[in-house]
UniProtKB/Swiss-Prot annotation:
Necessary for normal cell division and for the maintenance of normal septation. HAMAP family: GTPase_EngB (MF_00321). The lineage of its organism: Bacteria, Pseudomonadati, Pseudomonadota, Alphaproteobacteria, Rickettsiales. GTP binds at residues 46-53, 73-77, 91-94, 158-161, 189-191. Residues 38-210 form the EngB-type G domain. Keywords: Cell cycle, Cell division, GTP-binding, Magnesium, Metal-binding, Nucleotide-binding, Septation. Pfam families: MMR_HSR1. Its cofactor is Mg(2+). InterPro entries: G_ENGB_dom (IPR030393), GTP-bd (IPR006073), GTP-bd_ribosome_bio_YsxC (IPR019987), P-loop_NTPase (IPR027417). Belongs to the TRAFAC class TrmE-Era-EngA-EngB-Septin-like GTPase superfamily. EngB GTPase family. This is Probable GTP-binding protein EngB. GO terms for biological process: division septum assembly. It comes from Rickettsia peacockii (strain Rustic).
């Protein structure tokens, strides 16, 4: 990766794909339970309570698809959702401030790390950052892991309706990516206002296999 520039997102249309109903197909609480669907996978990763499950529900137009809780650490396994037999959406457990025993946190860390390192079908990782909190040390460690394993990722600032000025976030992301010597999309999304949903869908739709 040689460029330090943030590449803006182009709003190509992903709405056709996301008109289809996504469905839960598997959950994995340990590495032996991780399935292989032979379909492209896109993963959502971020700190506990950053809004991963809510965002998945928003882009899939189904508020009951991924279980949502105000309590950090409720997603305790990797959840897999099939979208129209074209794409697998992967909801990873949160890292950081989950109010769970250290042994459980370590188990989640192993599970998340193993999946991100070894998934053959993983095409894109969405690194979710709470707009109110900014990029933290744990987020940087995940980005380092992704780069070390040559995983493509994009930064998604969630809860963008909670902040009035995106410039500071933009500058923070720019500086962060410069230190990584990496270029990627940076998006701002809100489950409440639906800001950024169209752009995010478009970026995910690009990961599906082309029709032969």
């Amino acid at each position: 990766m040689t460029t330090q520039k943030i590449v803006p997102t182009k709003s190509t249309d992903g709405s056709k794909l996301f008109r289809h109903q996504a469905k839960f197909v598997a959950g994995a609480m340990n590495i032996n339970q991780i399935p292989n669907f032979s379909l492209p996978e896109i993963a959502f990763v971020g700190k506990s309570n950053v809004g991963k499950s809510s965002l998945i529900n928003t882009i899939c137009n189904n508020k009951n698809l991924a279980k949502v809780s105000n309590t950090a650490g409720r997603t305790r396994q990797i959840n897999f959702f099939n979208l129209a037999d074209k794409l697998i959406i992967v909801d990873l457990p949160g890292y950081g401030f989950a109010n769970v025993p250290i042994s459980v946190k370590e188990q989640w860390g192993v599970l998340i790390s193993y999946y991100l390192r070894n998934s053959y079908n993983l095409r894109l990782v969405n690194l979710l950052i709470d707009s109110r909190r900014g990029i933290k040390e744990n987020d940087k460690k995940v980005a380092d892991l992704l780069l070390a394993n040559k995983r493509e990722f994009q930064i998604i600032f969630t809860k963008s309706d909670k902040v009035t000025d995106h410039k500071n976030l933009h500058d923070e992301a720019h500086n962060f990516l410069a230190t990584l010597n990496y270029s990627c999309n940076v998006m701002y999304v809100s489950n409440r206002s639906k800001e950024g949903a169209r752009e995010l869908k478009a970026s995910l739709a690009k990961c599906i296999k082309p029709q032969k």
